[in-house]
Amino acid sequence: MKELKVSKINNGTVIDHLPPGRALKVLRLLGIDGSEGFMVLIAMNVYSKKLGGRKDIVKIENVYLSDEQTKALALIAPTATINIIRNGEVVEKRGVTLPDVVEGILTCPNSSCISRSKREPIKSKFLVVSKRPLKLKCHYCGEIIEEKEVSNYINLR
């Protein structure tokens, strides 16, 4: 039996069951580059019974994800599980859920889209056309974003 030996965190967030190779994208999404001063643990390509193969894990001490960050995480890692840790114990465990409509998280790739106009106070709005594979359609101009490119358009302010 394989055993994972990664340090525990006392307080913070564990993002588990990430598809292999996504841990670094998750850190980029969260704006974490290592200079913040809090502990970040990354395990990549470790064995997972749940996923039937490999997975990545990210542990972030003393950091908790906002609702917006959780929604963005669902766009790049729909199989992720978020564990909230307090005093060394898991106090909450939840999967991420991709909503049917994604608002204000993505930038439309179409430079002419009204949602990109600085003069219009309009949040971007994408309809989820397909969850697997992920395919999103801009509500305003109809531009399509495919799964492989979605992380390029995530814009958390």
UniProtKB/Swiss-Prot annotation:
HAMAP family, per database record: Asp_carb_tr_reg
Transmembrane segments: none
Zinc recorded as keyword: yes
Purpose of the protein: Involved in allosteric regulation of aspartate carbamoyltransferase.
A GO term from the CC aspect: aspartate carbamoyltransferase complex
InterPro entries: Asp_carbamoyltransf_reg_N (IPR020545), Asp_carbamoylTrfase_reg (IPR002801), Asp_carbamoyltrfase_reg_C (IPR020542), Asp_carbatrfase_reg_C_sf (IPR036792), Asp_carbatrfase_reg_N_sf (IPR036793)
Domain of life: Archaea
Organism for this UniProt entry: Ignicoccus hospitalis (strain KIN4/I / DSM 18386 / JCM 14125)
Annotated positions binding Zn(2+): C108, C113, C138, C141
Cofactor: Zn(2+)
Record-given protein name: Aspartate carbamoyltransferase regulatory chain
